Amino acid sequence: MLFPTPLISGRLERRYKRFLADVTLDDGRFITASVPNTGSMLGLTAPGSRVWLSFSDAPHRKYAHTLQIVEADNTLVGVNTGLPNRIAEEAILKGLIPDLDGYATLKREQKYGRNSRIDLLLDDGPRPRAYVEVKNVHFIRTPGLAEFPDTVTARGAKHLDELVDVVAAGHRGIMLFIIQRADCSRFGISGDLDPFYARAFERAIASGVEAWAVRCHITENGIDATELVPIEDMRRIE
């Protein structure tokens, strides 16, 4: 996935009100950018961090700049949670996930469950219809181990329960974690940060929901899904 226009670099001053960030650009300008991420962005908001932003002069936009990448631990990390669905689609179409090969139809944002929309729906294939829920991952606290979630996510647990219902109805329920950073070799559920989500994940896997984690390579030009990484046992829930 390529960024449509070259990104602009700068230094993060602060992130605040969840959706805003103050940035000093490399040319000296001080700007306020939109932050397309509703999560905590744990470990990614240190003042002084190198950041990269996209720019749009569309007249309807309140903020012309959008935060796309943060440098953390000498690694570029994608923070735009609007991109993982597109990255996941590209990963599936190029055969990066063999168990999702062979489907002739891929649809986006289809209604299902309890007033929800599934991110990707795969149909007309050699196996039952596959409902794919995509989650963005960018949290690391142990070298090499990417984790989800980085904060409590009741909505994420709800999606897991709906995938269980999908499996019970005879379809495939898929949880696909898109890791927007390259400095990891494995993935795990952070049960100590959200025990409720961890238990929901455990129930889902026991009920037949499938889970995959894909690592990405991030550059100033774009984000590319590169390979599957193994999913480890969850952190122990006290």
From Swiss-Prot:
Family annotation (HAMAP family): SfsA
Pfam families: SfsA, SfsA_N
GO molecular function (one): DNA binding
InterPro entries: SfsA (IPR005224), SfsA_C (IPR040452), SfsA_N (IPR041465)
Protein name per its UniProtKB record: Sugar fermentation stimulation protein homolog
Protein family (similarity comment): Belongs to the SfsA family.
